């Protein structure tokens, strides 16, 4: 495994650890999710280019489209929650409230 793959895997792992450890604010969770998607995109692109997978060359673009949709939905939820509750704390979001 080359150093590029190690660095990208480390970036994904650090983003995942950040998502698991710092989930008090919704904005930090969204940033960690974006870091995970970026590292997955780079890993897929490098793997497809190095192994000459011509049939899978659209997969990184599709992943990027899903990442953009996820970011748009996350930011719209962040705006809605901050307008409703005044903060972006995840602890305030109790799904059992009616």
From Swiss-Prot:
GO terms for molecular function: NADH dehydrogenase (ubiquinone) activity. It is found in: Mitochondrion inner membrane. It is a multi-pass membrane protein. Keywords: Electron transport, Membrane, Mitochondrion, Mitochondrion inner membrane, NAD, Respiratory chain, Translocase, Transmembrane, Transmembrane helix, Transport, Ubiquinone. It holds the Pfam family Oxidored_q2. Its EC number is 7.1.1.2. It catalyses: a ubiquinone + NADH + 5 H(+)(in) = a ubiquinol + NAD(+) + 4 H(+)(out). Gene3D superfamilies: 1.10.287.3510. One of its GO terms (biological process) is ATP synthesis coupled electron transport. One of its GO terms (cellular component) is mitochondrial inner membrane. The chain crosses the membrane at residues 1-21, 29-49, 61-81. Its main location: mitochondrion. It comes from the Eukaryota. Belongs to the complex I subunit 4L family. PANTHER family: NADH-UBIQUINONE OXIDOREDUCTASE CHAIN 4L (PTHR11434:SF0), NADH-UBIQUINONE OXIDOREDUCTASE SUBUNIT ND4L (PTHR11434). Core subunit of respiratory chain NADH dehydrogenase (Complex I) which is composed of 45 different subunits. Core subunit of the mitochondrial membrane respiratory chain NADH dehydrogenase (Complex I) which catalyzes electron transfer from NADH through the respiratory chain, using ubiquinone as an electron acceptor. Part of the enzyme membrane arm which is embedded in the lipid bilayer and involved in proton translocation. This is NADH-ubiquinone oxidoreductase chain 4L. It comes from Procyon lotor.
